[in-house]
């Protein structure tokens, strides 16, 4: 009796069509972005504020990685995507310190979780949990690339935007937070889609990356909803508009934003060598973008203000923000 091979993305298809890949994508979304999983990651915040502990990866047998584990996707395209991902992941120190600076005036505990603690002279005296987890990604992607390509690679580190304070810390954090959420969302979508085109140890590496990104996405998304309760619907609409910018149909956005979110999304896709992908692969990733966004919207619609408060509030937040300090009404369109 025929027994289909099963991996982390469901039934394995070595020559998949769009509909078979779609089934694997849907299966992975249910496994890694279920309501319970997202809720657990958000509810983990209070404990992580008190005693931050990095998520442990499973044991990976790197010697078991081989090119045949990439399925339904040309190896050179897969490798170009991995190279783009590791180049994007590489400047993690810059990412964490910039986010810490935006968070410190508003939520010191979240700032510490993200970027650790820094002395007056700029010396880092404690690494943030986010950096501890994310700094594993570039070495893992580099090793994955080298095992599949049988050649070494040196990351071409991208330039991260530096901290720029304007007039209102809440508005500054909101604009920066959009970049952060879009980046985490994009990474989660990419790694989940790549899981649908891999199996074996190669897929296991991608699943560890995905779990980290989903963890961070849930925390940043939930924190953003708590700090900016009027911004959730605008975020969904904005993410949809960014997906629109990479559709084959010519599109010129009329949206103006000082954060320049459009360039964030398009630059990310350019680094991933998007222009060389087949129409099928583009369609699969766009499908992944939309379905994960749908899942995040459904999950976030269930989060009450009381629940968000229980996950995100800390005494130092209220010490930093008097009741007289009115948050600006967030407008990004």
Ranges and model annotations:
Residues 1-333:
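Non-heme di-metal
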């Amino acid at each position: 009796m025929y027994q289909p091979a099963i991996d982390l993305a469901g039934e394995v298809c070595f020559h998949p069509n769009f509909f078979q890949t779609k089934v694997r994508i849907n299966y992975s979304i249910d496994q890694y972005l279920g309501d319970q999983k997202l809720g657990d990651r958000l509810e983990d915040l209070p404990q992580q504020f008190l005693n931050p502990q990095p998520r442990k990866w499973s044991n990976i047998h790197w010697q078991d990685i081989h090119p045949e584990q990439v399925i339904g996707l040309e190896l050179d395209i897969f490798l170009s995507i991995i190279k783009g991902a590791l180049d994007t992941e590489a400047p993690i120190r810059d990412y964490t310190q910039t986010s810490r600076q935006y968070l410190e005036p508003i939520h010191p505990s979240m700032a510490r979780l993200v970027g650790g603690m820094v002395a007056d002279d700029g010396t880092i005296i404690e690494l943030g949990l986010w950096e501890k987890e994310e700094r594993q990604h570039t070495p893992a992607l580099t090793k994955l690339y080298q095992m599949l390509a049988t050649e070494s690679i040196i990351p071409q580190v991208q330039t991260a935007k530096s901290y720029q304070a304007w007039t209102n810390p809440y508005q500054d954090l909101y604009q920066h937070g959009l970049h952060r959420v879009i980046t985490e969302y994009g990474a989660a979508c990419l790694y989940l889609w790549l899981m649908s085109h891999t199996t074996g140890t190669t897929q296991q590496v991608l699943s560890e990356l995905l779990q980290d990104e989903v963890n961070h996405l849930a925390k940043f998304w939930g924190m953003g909803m708590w700090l900016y309760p009027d911004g959730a619907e605008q975020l969904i609409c904005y993410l949809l508009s960014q997906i629109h910018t990479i559709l084959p149909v010519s599109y010129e956005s009329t949206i103006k934003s000082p954060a320049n979110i459009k360039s964030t999304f398009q630059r990310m896709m350019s680094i991933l060598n998007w222009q060389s992908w087949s129409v099928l692969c583009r369609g699969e990733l766009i499908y992944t973008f939309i379905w994960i966004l749908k899942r995040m919207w459904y999950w976030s619609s269930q989060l009450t203000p009381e629940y968000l408060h229980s996950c995100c509030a800390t005494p130092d937040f209220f010490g930093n923000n008097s009741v007289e300090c009115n948050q600006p009404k967030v407008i990004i369109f």
